[in-house]
């Protein structure tokens, strides 16, 4: 059985043909072109891809992991700040009418968390809180394969969480880290990305290391709040910069241990995402199979 799964972000649309075990038969990506083509352009790209896939493979269903706040019952986009013309997109209605296949739609952070719980860093955890650190910072709570959505489907929107240094988005995102290091080093911010920042840290740059330490302290404030509130088995950290586990793990573990008594720390500690770019599609597949 083959399923068509997508992970729709502001920059790229990732897609894959996946079997029921989570094995990818084919995958790829294409630019979202969100600012020029908006929501209607994304719908056109996805539908065109599925039509091409169907010429080679019969499909069992379609799973969408997508940016934005999602009405999972209706399968539509309630709100999407970063993609013009995307709010209100009725994905489920469009896809089921066009292809006559079962379809699920879920928020991308929720799907990534579920993918890590099913086939990634959270496989041995009954419950986990996933934190994705990138342009902003997002979260999702999974317990026994179920996503906590909240009353208005905004559970896990930790970007708005307040910590001593300010709003978590403003003080614990990859955007913050790169911007602050560029500012402190008087470098062109357009030329400073995560790779540049961690290269400086590895080279022993004191300025970059000091900013990274502040970033880790700020992030640990947020993680401590999450541990107190949700008491998960573990916290899974994802996003591009979390590939730097060797540098980040000791700093974050030390900072978290300084904030909480041992009994309140996640029993299985911090884990770093294993499935990365595939996690959202795997989470969508898991939900699709649960629907059957």
What are these regions (language model features)?
Residues 1-61, 72-76, 93-101, 115-125, ...:
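ATP-binding/phosphotransfer module of carbohydrate and carboxylate kinases, centering on a glycine-rich
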Residues 67-70, 134-136, 241:
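Short glycine-rich anion-binding loops that position phosphate/pyrophosphate groups of nucleotides
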Residues 123-175:
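Glycine-rich phosphate-binding loop of actin/hexokinase-like ATP-binding domains
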Residues 103-107:
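General beta-strand structural signal in soluble alpha/beta enzymes
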Residues 27-30, 81, 151:
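Short hydrophobic alpha-helix segments
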């Amino acid at each position: 059985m083959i399923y068509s799964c997508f992970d729709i972000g502001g920059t790229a649309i990732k897609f894959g043909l996946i079997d029921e075990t989570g094995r990818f038969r084919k995958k790829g990506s294409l630019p979202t072109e969100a600012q020029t083509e908006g929501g209607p352009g994304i719908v056109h790209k996805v539908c065109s891809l599925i039509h091409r896939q169907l010429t080679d493979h019969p499909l069992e269903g379609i799973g969408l992991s997508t940016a934005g706040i999602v009405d999972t019952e209706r399968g539509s986009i309630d709100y999407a700040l970063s993609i013009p013309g995307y709010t209100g997109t009725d994905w489920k209605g469009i896809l089921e009418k066009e292809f006559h296949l079962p379809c699920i739609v879920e928020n991308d952070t929720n799907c990534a968390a579920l993918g890590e719980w099913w086939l990634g860093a959270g496989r041995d955890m009954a419950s986990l809180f996933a934190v994705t650190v990138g342009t902003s910072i997002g979260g999702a709570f999974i317990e026994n394969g179920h996503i906590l959505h909240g009353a208005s489907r905004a559970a896990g929107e930790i970007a708005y969480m307040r910590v001593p240094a300010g709003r978590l988005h403003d003080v614990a995102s990859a955007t913050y880290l790169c911007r602050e290091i560029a500012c402190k080093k008087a470098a062109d911010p357009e030329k400073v990305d995560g790779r540049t920042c961690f290269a400086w840290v590895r080279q022993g740059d004191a300025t970059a290391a000091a900013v990274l330490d502040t970033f880790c302290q700020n992030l640990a404030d947020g993680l401590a709040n999450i541990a107190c509130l949700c008491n998960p088995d573990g916290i899974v950290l994802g996003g591009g910069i979390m590939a730097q586990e060797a540098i980040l793990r000791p700093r974050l573990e030390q900072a978290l241990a300084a904030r909480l008594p041992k009994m309140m720390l996640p029993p299985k500690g911090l884990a770093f995402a294993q499935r990365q770019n595939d996690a959202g599609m795997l989470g969508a597949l898991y939900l699709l199979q649960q629907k059957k």
